[in-house]
Amino acid sequence: PCFLCAKNRPAEQMHRVVESRYELLVNPFPILPVHFTLPTLKHQPQRILPMIGDMLRLAQRNSDLTLLYNGPHCGASAPDHAHLQAVSSGILPLQRSWQRLNHNLTEVAKTDDEEGIWQMADYPAAALVIRSHSVEHGERLFKSIYRALPPAEDQTEPMMNVIAWSNGDELLTVVMPRKKHRPDCYTAQGDAQFMISPGAVDMGGLIITPREEDFRKLTPDVVTAIYREVSLTPE
């Protein structure tokens, strides 16, 4: 049974309907001080296109939260039930480094002086950032990226993680195209094994290690190698 469907959740689980089609749930296994899961009221597959507008609206209305999307084979814990996540804003290293990253962006497409799509040249994973001043413009720019990405084998959408937050009067949406679910080190043997299956939080620079031994032996070089292995090549 699907653990995000209301009929299968514990009676103690508090919930609130938001945007008329999601339930706001406190994540029972949080990885950040504030961590919500927002499943759709209806059981339906994890797909970004029907949710991107809602994701941007939630980010715009809740500047203290960062919205996350994990594709079906990109860290999603429930790929058969559509959901977003929301966490405390400003905690991910991606966000904390934004002022620096912002100074080395490669233009991909612009709609005016301030809105458009840029490639993040200084980030270790393949990443595109959408800068927009409205949900509608952000959604339109996202769809142009979506259409340009290669479809994944046996899946109905390109592999990706998406991170969105409000930055003053603009919306920032970081799209991280993927080519692989997990790095080879996930199934490696002995000291070569790292049980890291990256989702949006990990791709945003905060690596979650279920095992203490992985935490202790993790290095920047290993993290960079994982990013490069699972990311679509920047080209």
Regions from the PLM with identified roles:
Residues 61-96:
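Active-site beta-strand/loop microenvironment that shapes enzyme catalytic pockets
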Residues 60-66, 152-157:
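Short secondary-structure junctions
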Residues 1-54, 77, 89-235:
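Active-site microenvironments that recognize anionic phosphate/pyrophosphate groups
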